[in-house]
């Protein structure tokens, strides 16, 4: 059975680009009589607001994109605990203690030398004593996933054959120093646990997909079919943003735009029709 998901973060109102992703996942699931899951990415307690959760549901209902069930990532922290413990036991999740300013300085030095700004894995060479001293001085560190530095390849549902050299990508941070789980880990764990078969999202996630494929395999999950669509931009060519409210769906609704017209445009946009 085809199982898809739409996973917005409740940090602002949905914009037209979000609608396009939601519509694609909804149609893909319903075409195959599958399941469409609304997954609220609310692992950030400071930025996530209930008013935005309610607004997301209202927008999807207005469009007629009815979900089969709702999941909240904030209620699934135990699963993320178990997954991170598993990755630690396999030696692919390691603690780092650099501050944001230190990491920024490293990136600038690499760029000045004509090198890609990739994390140098300095934390992997720390002795146990050095780790203990840093923890005493700075507190808990953040945790990174150790990528296998080979090419990650997959056949994308839209972009076809893709290949990313993992050596050109920094080991992704999965857990912040304050213990908060970041999107990359939560998304992978949920996709595995919910049996997601297809993921349709923006092309800005292509590099994320490469790292997530390695993480899914590291956790023993089955890699879903990925498809990355082109991104929409605002009137001035700027990227759409929930926080900035660019082309917010609520504004289009208030302007009298009808749901069928909007869905029809989003479904055909970028196609030969």
Question: Where are each of the predicted segments found?
Answer:
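Active-site cores that bind ATP or allylic diphosphates and position pyrophosphate for catalysis
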Residues: 95, 99-228, 233-240, 248
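An acidic- and aromatic-residue-enriched active-site/binding cleft used to recognize and process polar
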Residues: 9, 41-43, 202-204, 231, ...
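Short, conserved loop/turn and helix-capping segments at secondary-structure boundaries
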Residues: 19, 50, 202-209, 243-246, ...
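Hydrophobic alpha-helical scaffolding
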Residues: 46, 73, 201-205, 251-256
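N-terminal Rossmann-like or analogous alpha/beta NTP/dinucleotide-binding catalytic cores
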Residues: 1-113, 207-221
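Short helix-capping/linker segments at secondary-structure and domain boundaries
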Residues: 31-35, 194, 270-273
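Glycine/charged-rich beta-loop-alpha catalytic/anionic-binding loops adjacent to active sites
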Residues: 4-8, 193, 244
């Amino acid at each position: 059975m085809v199982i898809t998901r739409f996973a917005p973060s409740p940090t602002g109102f949905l914009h037209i680009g979000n609608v396009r992703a939601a519509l694609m996942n909804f149609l893909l699931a319903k075409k195959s009589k599958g399941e469409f899951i609304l997954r609220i990415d609310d692992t950030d307690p400071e930025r996530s607001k209930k008013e935005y959760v309610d607004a997301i549901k209202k927008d999807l209902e207005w469009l007629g994109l009815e979900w089969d069930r709702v999941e909240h990532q904030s209620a699934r922290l135990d699963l993320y605990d178990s997954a991170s413990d598993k990755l630690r036991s396999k030696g692919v999740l390691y603690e780092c203690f650099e501050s944001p300013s230190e990491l920024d300085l490293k990136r600038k030095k690499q760029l000045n030398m004509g090198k890609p700004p990739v994390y140098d894995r300095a934390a992997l060479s720390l002795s146990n004593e050095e780790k203990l001293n840093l923890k005493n001085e700075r507190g808990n560190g953040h945790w990174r996933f150790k990528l296998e530095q080979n090419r990650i390849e997959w056949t994308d549902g839209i972009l076809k054959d893709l290949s990313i050299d993992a050596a050109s990508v920094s080991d992704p941070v999965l857990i912040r120093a304050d213990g908060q789980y970041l999107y990359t880990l939560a998304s992978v764990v949920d996709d595995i646990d919910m049996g997601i078969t297809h993921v349709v999202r923006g092309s800005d996630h292509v590099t994320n997909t490469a790292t997530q494929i390695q993480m899914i395999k590291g956790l023993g999950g089955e890699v879903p079919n990925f498809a990355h669509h082109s991104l929409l931009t605002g009137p001035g060519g700027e990227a759409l943003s929930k926080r900035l409210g660019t082309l917010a769906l609520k504004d289009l609704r208030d302007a009298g735009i009808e749901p069928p017209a909007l869905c029809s445009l989003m479904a055909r946009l970028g196609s030969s029709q």
